[in-house]
A protein has these predicted regions:
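Extended, solvent-exposed, turn-rich assembly/linker loops in the middle of proteins
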Residues: 147-228
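Intrinsically disordered or highly flexible coil/loop and linker segments, enriched in small
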Residues: 40, 44, 136-139, 197-200, ...
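N-terminal catalytic cores of peptidoglycan-degrading enzymes
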Residues: 1-54, 267-268
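Sequence/fold signature of self-assembling virion shell proteins
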Residues: 2-11, 15-20, 211-301
């Protein structure tokens, strides 16, 4: 299941405090509406809707040596058997369920006075914080694969996204083979040589790098992205030095033991109502080569 399987459009804007506290699904809808705009975890990983049992998921990382058999198939002659083929099986790994959430209190006075704006701000802050944590964990998972040397890596000696010049003084224009998109093309070629069916569709960078890309390429950028079939996305948890190319259909998975859930309960001694929201994800990298990284040798400070 996804982060919020029953995700619905919340078009009424501000939440009615009493209605929300009586029916927490209203708050769930609001959090889901806010989160879906920036929920990176479901952008870079495929969502697996199968149930999670036992608080963990057993999975394996597939590399090119696991994708084909060690020996080749052979032609069969009449009356013969086909050749027995063998392959190296990847080692099983264990991903444990994580549990992230928070709660806030609404006083009876705020409820009675229908303090809508403060309540909506509290809900929005909780939604933003849960989203931030899930995005942070997604990028930490990707970065761990990079640090372990499992991803497709390219250290490029050409111009960085900040340094590239594609117009202006002809003497200052960066040669085509030294431009960042040349590095992107080389990564695509490397992935194709692996013959694993990888199709990168996300170009993931830091906010500053995204600004540099837009500034450098201007109106030519949409055409370049379309050429490669890429969507440009950014995250605060990406290092300015790194550019990620991701095939979300193959890179990894995210499952939820419990998706986005909101509950509320009375705290009669303090004459207030608690609102609690949480999600319990589990994620893992299943095909590290579906994540590529480009690191430019020269990068302006």
């Amino acid at each position: 299941m996804g982060f919020y399987p029953a995700r619905a459009d919340y078009s009424d804007g501000i939440i009615s405090v009493d209605e929300a506290l009586n029916d927490p699904t209203v708050i769930t809808e609001r959090i889901g509406e806010i989160a879906k705009k920036n929920l990176l975890i479901e952008t870079i990983f495929s969502t697996d809707n199968s149930p999670v049992t036992g608080g963990s998921v057993i999975y394996s990382k597939t590399t090119e040596k696991n994708f084909y058999t060690d020996n080749d198939v052979t032609q069969r002659q009449p009356g013969d058997e086909y050749t027995v083929v063998y392959r190296e099986r990847p080692e099983a790994e264990l991903a444990r369920v994580e549990d992230y959430g928070g709660k806030f209190a609404v006083s009876d006075e705020a409820r009675r006075r229908n303090n809508e704006i403060d309540f909506d701000n509290d809900v929005t802050a909780l939604a933003n914080t849960i989203t931030r944590k899930l995005n942070q964990r997604a990028l930490e998972t990707v970065k761990a694969a990079y640090d372990a040397g499992e991803t497709v890596k390219l250290v490029d000696g050409g111009a960085s996204w900040a340094d590239v010049r594609i117009d202006g003084n002809p003497a200052e224009i960066t040669p085509a083979r030294q431009r960042p998109f040349s590095a992107v093309a080389n990564v695509f070629a490397s992935a194709e040589k692996l013959d694993l069916g990888i199709e990168y569709s996300k170009l993931l960078v830091s906010p500053q790098t995204k600004a540099n890309i837009i500034s450098s390429y201007g109106t030519t950028l949409p055409g370049l992205l379309d050429t490669f079939g890429l969507e440009l996305i950014s995250s605060n948890y990406v290092d300015d030095r790194l550019t990620y190319l991701i095939d979300p259909g193959k890179a990894g998975f995210v499952k939820y033991e419990e998706p986005l859930t909101v509950t509320s309960w009375r705290d009669e001694p303090h004459r207030q109502t608690w609102v609690q929201g949480y999600a319990m994800p589990v994620m893992g990298i299943t095909l590290p080569a579906a994540i590529a990284t480009i690191e430019f040798a020269e990068l302006d400070a």
